[in-house]
Amino acid sequence: MAGHSKWANIQHRKGRQDAKRGKMFTKAAKEIIIAAKAGGDPVGNSRLRAAIAAAKAINLPKDKIENAIKKGTGELAGGDILEMAYEGYGPGGVALIVEVATDNKNRTVAEVRHILSKHGGSMGESGCVAWMFDRKGVITLEKDKYTEEQLMEVALEAGAEDVTDEGESWEVVTAAADFNAVREALEAAGVEMQSAEFTMVPQNEIEVDVETGRKLMRLVDALEDNDDVQNVHANFDLPDELLAELG
């Protein structure tokens, strides 16, 4: 599948780097705040349940999880966070979707536009590239805890599209509509998840040369360093030479 590309693997490695600098804590807390707006009880709120599971997987402290829930429900101040997605282009005509969670959309759109422009990209209108992607659910699990057969039996029975080997982990991919059912089936089977989230999978990928790939990675790094940016999705695939450098 298009989602299981060298670009996807780089995102996983970058995720671990983000965790080292604390970026993932901020992202996880914001996702909990947004999810809790629909209700503070994870039993009846599947998005909140997934957000809490993802936060625990990166060891976000319990008090921070609880405070984030209270912000989302309005029990504490600081819950005025909006989630938005900006679309645009990077070097080489690569399509980008930048998902943000912000308390000031004017500030955030200006910052995202500036970052894109500085790195050879441009902001586009809403809908300009979203049609190039499919929304999927992706559940990540530790490689050494489960066999592919174990996961296939549970996940595919619950409606998953695929179980793939991503090197250090397994990935269970679902259609957006089947995400909660698959995640709940894995939970019921006692499977521990490293992460469970929605992502935008490109329908087709653009193979870029090494220099363009370097420019794109600098752009992605700059976007992800912004405190309001939650996720960056793109439709490029990196050449093996550059992948080796980044690995």
From Swiss-Prot:
Sorted keywords for this record are: Cytoplasm, DNA-binding, Transcription, Transcription regulation
Q: Does the keyword Nucleotide-binding apply?
A: no
**Record-stated family:** Belongs to the TACO1 family.
A GO biological process held by the record:
regulation of DNA-templated transcription
GO MF entry, a single one: DNA binding
What domain of life does the native source organism fall in? Answer: Bacteria
Stretch list, region Disordered: 1-22
Name of the protein in its database record: Probable transcriptional regulatory protein Dvul_0986
Q: Which InterPro entries does the annotation name?
A: Integrase-like_N, TACO1_YebC-like_2nd/3rd_dom, TACO1_YebC_N, Transcrip_reg_TACO1-like, Transcrip_reg_TACO1-like_dom3, YebC-like
Q: Does the keyword Disulfide bond apply?
A: no
Record localization:
Cytoplasm
Supply the HAMAP family for this chain: Transcrip_reg_TACO1
Show which residues constitute the signal peptide: none
Q: Where the protein is mainly located, per its record?
A: cytoplasm
